[in-house]
Amino acid sequence: MESIEVRVRTGSRLVSDFTSEIRDFCRRHGDGLLNVFLPHATAGLALIETGSGSEADLAAAIDRFLPRDLAYRHTHGSPGHGRDHLLPALISPSLTLPVLGGEIQLGIWQSVVIVDTNVDNPVRTVRLSFVDA
């Protein structure tokens, strides 16, 4: 297994497309499985279509499911930070993707994105681990 860490600046963006970094890593490999893991308590990974309004739809859904102004018991950090800690329960911090001939096998409209509601931490670490077939 090969495993690397990649640092990503998400800044204030809710959705950061990470697909090109994953493609670059997979090109060095043949067939196998890629695990993408985000070792943070306030962010997750998702497969969505980007550039078609899905990012705004996702933001609206997160605001409905996890409103920032709810009275969370988890109170450190900026206002609404309690919801950030609930996000990975709804949007997993890991994905496992098939790789064939060094190419991740995504659907035509799928992109791998980091979903990050925590504006207090603008830099994230992503672990990419490849297991050969």
Question: Whereabouts are the PLM-identified features?
Answer:
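Active-site histidine-anchored catalytic micro-motif
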Residues: 1-133
